[in-house]
Amino acid sequence: MSGHGAPAPAPVDCSDLRVAVVAASWHTQVMDGLIAGAQRALADYHVAEHRLVRVPGAFELAVVADALARQHYDVVVALGVVIRGGTPHFDYVCQAVTEGLVRVALDRSLPVGFGVLTCDGDQQALDRAGLEGSKEDKGYEATSAALLTARTLKELGTTAP
């Protein structure tokens, strides 16, 4: 979800959902904003308790998201930042993180909020971090999307294996 045309769903009661947030540690200022946005969404959706787990970097998000999924959480939100440098490393990390998180979602039938910023520079990340003056709040958006997806799956009678 990005910029113009993004949905603005009204928060629904998700107090019955078990939620875990896994967050990378690189780019502290941006990560603090993403985590704060996720926590605002959890409050808006009436999720009283959640688990926050920190990992070193974005690459580690998928394996920890999978471990949390196996602990019977209804929702996992993954937050991280990858900023393009001068080597192909950016492309490999972004692809691996995306594919890993999609695998967790599909293999576990579990909503995984994708709050991983893949940016060309620091300013793009700051603009999306939900900080004062930011244009977007991707931590909030990723959490909201995952919660709404979990609610939809519950309404469909779908449960994780």
UniProtKB/Swiss-Prot annotation:
<dbReference type="GO" id="GO:0009231">
    <property type="term" value="P:riboflavin biosynthetic process"/>
</dbReference>
<dbReference type="Pfam" id="PF00885">
    <property type="entry name" value="DMRL_synthase"/>
</dbReference>
<feature type="binding site">
    <location>
        <position position="26"/>
    </location>
    <ligand>
        <name>5-amino-6-(D-ribitylamino)uracil</name>
    </ligand>
</feature>
<feature type="active site" description="Proton donor">
    <location>
        <position position="89"/>
    </location>
</feature>
<dbReference type="GO" id="GO:0009349">
    <property type="term" value="C:riboflavin synthase complex"/>
</dbReference>
<feature type="binding site">
    <location>
        <position position="114"/>
    </location>
    <ligand>
        <name>5-amino-6-(D-ribitylamino)uracil</name>
    </ligand>
</feature>
<dbReference type="InterPro" id="IPR034964">
    <property type="entry name" value="LS"/>
</dbReference>
<dbReference type="InterPro" id="IPR002180">
    <property type="entry name" value="LS/RS"/>
</dbReference>
<comment type="similarity">
    <text>Belongs to the DMRL synthase family.</text>
</comment>
<dbReference type="GO" id="GO:0000906">
    <property type="term" value="F:6,7-dimethyl-8-ribityllumazine synthase activity"/>
</dbReference>
<keyword id="KW-0808">Transferase</keyword>
<feature type="binding site">
    <location>
        <begin position="58"/>
        <end position="60"/>
    </location>
    <ligand>
        <name>5-amino-6-(D-ribitylamino)uracil</name>
    </ligand>
</feature>
<comment type="pathway">
    <text>Cofactor biosynthesis; riboflavin biosynthesis; riboflavin from 2-hydroxy-3-oxobutyl phosphate and 5-amino-6-(D-ribitylamino)uracil: step 1/2.</text>
</comment>
<dbReference type="InterPro" id="IPR036467">
    <property type="entry name" value="LS/RS_sf"/>
</dbReference>
<dbReference type="GO" id="GO:0005829">
    <property type="term" value="C:cytosol"/>
</dbReference>
<keyword id="KW-0686">Riboflavin biosynthesis</keyword>
<feature type="binding site">
    <location>
        <begin position="86"/>
        <end position="87"/>
    </location>
    <ligand>
        <name>(2S)-2-hydroxy-3-oxobutyl phosphate</name>
    </ligand>
</feature>
<feature type="binding site">
    <location>
        <begin position="81"/>
        <end position="83"/>
    </location>
    <ligand>
        <name>5-amino-6-(D-ribitylamino)uracil</name>
    </ligand>
</feature>
<protein>
    <recommendedName>
        <fullName>6,7-dimethyl-8-ribityllumazine synthase</fullName>
        <ecNumber>2.5.1.78</ecNumber>
    </recommendedName>
</protein>
<comment type="function">
    <text>Catalyzes the formation of 6,7-dimethyl-8-ribityllumazine by condensation of 5-amino-6-(D-ribitylamino)uracil with 3,4-dihydroxy-2-butanone 4-phosphate. This is the penultimate step in the biosynthesis of riboflavin.</text>
</comment>
<feature type="binding site">
    <location>
        <position position="128"/>
    </location>
    <ligand>
        <name>(2S)-2-hydroxy-3-oxobutyl phosphate</name>
    </ligand>
</feature>
